[in-house]
Amino acid sequence: RRLLKDLDIRINQIIPEGGSVEDSKNLPKARFNLIPYREVGLMTAMYLNKEFGMPYVSTTPMGAVDMAECIRQIKKYIDTLAAPILSSKRVDYESYIDGQTRFV
């Protein structure tokens, strides 16, 4: 949660935390899925990708290298989704990555 909040990304749902069958109807509203632990949620993300074309990031943001890779993958999806709307502006998370990994 903190990572997405720091990146100013709104969370649609956290599954299975507090989720219900009723809440599952909102799953396709997400722009992409973040699967921080491949053991939990990867098959669901693969299904949503197949059925709804919803991309997912499955790199666990743990450790400096993987956190940076995860953020760069998120950036790629955000830039792709925003391209038709924000033709000249892209998100830039490199300063955040630098701040989080500089002294590791």
Curated annotation (Swiss-Prot):
Its EC number is 1.3.7.7. Binds 1 [4Fe-4S] cluster per heterodimer. The cluster is bound at the heterodimer interface by residues from both subunits. One of its GO terms (biological process) is light-independent chlorophyll biosynthetic process. GO terms for molecular function: 4 iron, 4 sulfur cluster binding; ATP binding; metal ion binding; oxidoreductase activity. Its cofactor is [4Fe-4S] cluster. It catalyses: chlorophyllide a + oxidized 2[4Fe-4S]-[ferredoxin] + 2 ADP + 2 phosphate = protochlorophyllide a + reduced 2[4Fe-4S]-[ferredoxin] + 2 ATP + 2 H2O. It is found in: Plastid, Chloroplast. InterPro entries: ChlB/BchB/BchZ, Nase/OxRdtase_comp1. It holds the Pfam family Oxidored_nitro. Pathway: Porphyrin-containing compound metabolism; chlorophyll biosynthesis (light-independent). Component of the dark-operative protochlorophyllide reductase (DPOR) that uses Mg-ATP and reduced ferredoxin to reduce ring D of protochlorophyllide (Pchlide) to form chlorophyllide a (Chlide). This reaction is light-independent. The NB-protein (ChlN-ChlB) is the catalytic component of the complex. PANTHER family: LIGHT-INDEPENDENT PROTOCHLOROPHYLLIDE REDUCTASE SUBUNIT B (PTHR33712:SF7). Belongs to the ChlB/BchB/BchZ family. This is Light-independent protochlorophyllide reductase subunit B. It comes from Picea mariana (Black spruce).
